[in-house]
Amino acid sequence: MIVDSSFNLAVHALICLSHSGRSLSSEALAENICTNPTRVRRVLAGLKKAGMVETREGLDGGYRLTADPATLSLRQVAEAVNTRFVDCAWHSGDIDRDCSICSGMAGVMDALYRSMNEECTAYLSHITILSLIHISEPTRP
């Protein structure tokens, strides 16, 4: 199973934008996230469509957080970037076989993965971007 990194990138970008309090370019975000600006733009397009960020062109342009980090849940972020936490591209068995186990296993596993994704997104409903900002800030002496 492979989990798409879009959710991780989106959360990281939202924390950066919230912490900075100003617009940041895709290049500045990419530098902090340790990825490339094209990937940042691709993922943040989903956040923009969901109304979490806005973009502005020009000298002071870039991405700016428009959502309230105190109420923006990780579930909302996951939904904005179409995250599936549990997925499997390969299925065992063969739907065309006479064996009920062999022909039914893909459906059984898909239902299991669907339930696991529902549990993950329900859990994320209770975690906000602001709560992660407090966790991500290191304690300094």
What are these language model-derived features?
Residues I2-T35:
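N-terminal helix-turn-helix DNA-binding core of bacterial DNA-binding proteins
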Residues T38:
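Key DNA-contact positions within bacterial/archaeal DNA-binding proteins
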Residues E79-L132:
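Amphipathic alpha-helical dimerization/coiled-coil segments
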Residues G51-T66:
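Beta-hairpin "wing" of winged helix-turn-helix
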Residues I133-T139:
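Conserved small/polar residues in nucleotide/adenosyl-binding loops
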Residues L44-K48:
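Basic amphipathic alpha-helical segments that dock to polyanions
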